[in-house]
Amino acid sequence: MSDLTLFVHTHVDKYPTTSDWHRTISTVDVKGAEQIPLAMPGTRLDEFDGIRFAASADATHVGVCHYRRRPLFMQQELCHHPRIHMEPTPSNLAMLESSTQRKAALEILQSHDCIQYRPFVLSMGYRQQFALYTPVEAWDILLDVLSRLGLGESLGFYRHSNAHVWCSLLIAKREMVADFSAFALNVAAILAQDPAYAALLAKTPRLTALVLERLVPLWVFHHRLKSAYVPMVILEKEAL
């Protein structure tokens, strides 16, 4: 298994009323090879409300481990990697209900060796909430564009036992241009020239910009890692 681990923290409107913690473990078979079981998380990982991803070295498998306990962070993903240490942004910390929660959140991060903090959040957001000002189709276009550029492979949708959350998994290759402006132009060109997007672009002129906004953290994430492949996730809230 790769040493890359991606924690994706989710926040949903309703939590179980029982005292039992809800936990599911599964493995996603990407290319039909033998599945690789996901190792159990380390100490205090159950303090997080999130999902742990681990990929094999050749990126043929992605392991998914979903833990739900309490919503420490809202609309935020954290990355934990031997060479990268992330922290919540001040604005996201301010969203927590109390200073006690903020202190607890930082203590949990420190317990996972996240000592060197950097202001970086890989935030793809919730489909339902972004849909208030972002066309839902933008998510599908994002995956399609990455595939056309040869930068990633969509694994389709994976539904957690939590009925409120869907996930769209993506294996992203590190073969991305060094200059983001050039990369953005390639994406914009695909959106502008493909007839399939013509009607959608005419209805939503800002669609290109909205898609590019989702690509920025993906690009930054790639260039902060030495890994050849990066497991990505887009959290989507189920439409009511």
Residue map of PLM features:
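ER/Golgi luminal nucleotide-sugar-dependent glycosyltransferases, focusing on the catalytic module
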Residues: 1-240
